[in-house]
Amino acid sequence: MSRAGEVRHATALETVSVTVPEHALELYEAALLSVCGTVGFFLDDDTGLWLVEGVKDQGAHEPELLAALALTDAAAGLQPLVQRRPTHADGWLARTHSAFPEQPVGRRFTIRGTHLTDAALPGRIPVVLDAAIAFGSGEHGSTRGCLRALERIAYRQPKRILDMGTGTGILAMAAAKLLHRTAKATDIEPWSVRVARENVGRNGLTPLIHVRRADGWSAPWVVTGAPYDLVFANILARPLCRMAGSLSRYLAPNGRAILSGLLQRQVRWVLSAHRQHGLVLDATLHEGAWATLVLRHGCG
């Protein structure tokens, strides 16, 4: 899974990485995002630890990076080894392109990088992303699960749609293209908002998708759009649990919530948090170690 700023350079880059337990994942992701153009995190199935790595200009923002990591170490009670490796921009971009071919997802979608010049797969809805900053979006199990879940509930024709923690904007764009509806998309990170807006524009969806920075459900702009018929939240298990009450409050009586960013072993925990607020399981989808949940109100 990745979040992105902008990495479009012809100069040398470096990759900075740490390996941390799950409870510290969000903290170290935020620390690297403060100075890195793109950040990804990857689960080691054998150890249960997470590799968090970011790409930035080589030697740039050193004081800020060291300060962010020191504060994060103190907050997490950890001192993970910080590893660095030089990464040439041209080589990094070439590897990213080669690792990001067209990716068919489910029955309807295909995810394409901007570097691809051939025609999209026939009979599928293309969603175009900048491969340089969106690597991790299309092939990640949580994203694929959300897109499959969207196909599953499309027959309900939801009208009011929210993508919470939009990242690259991929889920809002897929919903707008499949359902021909408007959508709201939010993210707490300013760079994610910029990236999502760029992707929305390159997909010709600016009239349909409105992207703004928001901290979860606290923003009036988010709340005024409620109740929502469809809510995406492809984030992580802990914030999903924290926001369960708000999701229940602002989800329409017959609405559906598509939640992901959680591992299969976290399903019971996340479900328990949402059941306390009257939401029940409608469907579960699996992609590798990742799970996607479709939830509804108990009366829906």
Mark where each language-model region is:
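N-terminal auxiliary segments of SAM/dcSAM-dependent transferases
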Residues: 11, 17-120
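S-adenosylmethionine
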Residues: 188-299
